[in-house]
Amino acid sequence: MENTQENPTSQNPTPADETARQAAEAAAPQQEAAANAATDSPVNAEQSALAEAEAKIAELQESFLRAKAETENVRRRAQEDVAKAHKFAIESFAEHLLPVIDSLEAAVAHSSDDLQKVREGVELTLRQLTGALEKGRVVALNPVGEKFDPHRHQAISMVPAEQEPNTVVAVLQKGFVIADRVLRPALVTVAAPK
């Protein structure tokens, strides 16, 4: 059932009710202003924090782009340096070989019937070539008497010998290393086990 009876105070306000209503109406704009101020303060603070964060992001992005560009430049320069090193790595070695070529050309141009002079010229040229190879860090392996090393030697045969087993007895073809890397293993004969 519906309540047909109305609140008597809602239709006939008392003087105390009227005073309370007026006080509430007067206080409402102040409360609203205080609420707006309270909400404006956090909004302003948030906006300034957001602006600071955006400025920091822009600064970091600029720093990142500069660092990225610098990294790319360093990488490009390093690639160019490596390419130049590959291109001209043999230059110094070739310079050391030029006197050998000069000696061989002089020997070919000068014909001599004296076999001893030809031999001396060939020996001199061989010394020049060996010196040029050594300056290029190419060194001959002469492993006679050493223990057989499969990384530096290639055994052609095993022969009975007085030396310890697996010792290099003879070198059939010299091996060469370049800066501790085997360029060509030495072809050797090895002492057989007794």
Curated annotation (Swiss-Prot):
Check the record and name the InterPro entries matching this protein: GrpE (IPR000740), GrpE_coiled_coil (IPR013805), GrpE_head (IPR009012)
Does the UniProt entry include the keyword Iron? no
Q: Which domain of life is it from?
A: Bacteria
One GO CC term of this entry? cytosol
Subcellular location(s): the record lists: Cytoplasm
MF terms from GO for this chain are: adenyl-nucleotide exchange factor activity; protein homodimerization activity; protein-folding chaperone binding; unfolded protein binding
Keyword annotations for this protein, in alphabetical order, are: Chaperone, Cytoplasm, Stress response
Query: What broad class describes the main subcellular location of this protein?
Result: cytoplasm
- Spell out the Polar residues composition-biased ranges: 1-14
Bias class Low complexity marks the residues at 21-38
Q: Name one Pfam family in it.
A: GrpE
Where in this protein does the record put region Disordered? 1-50
Sorted alphabetically, the Gene Ontology BP terms of this entry are:
protein folding
Per the similarity annotation, which family is this? Belongs to the GrpE family.
Q: What NCBIfam families would the database entry show?
A: PRK14139.1 (NF010737), PRK14140.1 (NF010738), PRK14150.1 (NF010748)
How does the annotation summarize its subunit structure? Answer: Homodimer.
Function according to Swiss-Prot or TrEMBL: Participates actively in the response to hyperosmotic and heat shock by preventing the aggregation of stress-denatured proteins, in association with DnaK and GrpE. It is the nucleotide exchange factor for DnaK and may function as a thermosensor. Unfolded proteins bind initially to DnaJ; upon interaction with the DnaJ-bound protein, DnaK hydrolyzes its bound ATP, resulting in the formation of a stable complex. GrpE releases ADP from DnaK; ATP binding to DnaK triggers the release of the substrate protein, thus completing the reaction cycle.
The protein's name: Protein GrpE
Q: Source organism lineage?
A: Bacteria, Pseudomonadati, Pseudomonadota, Betaproteobacteria, Burkholderiales
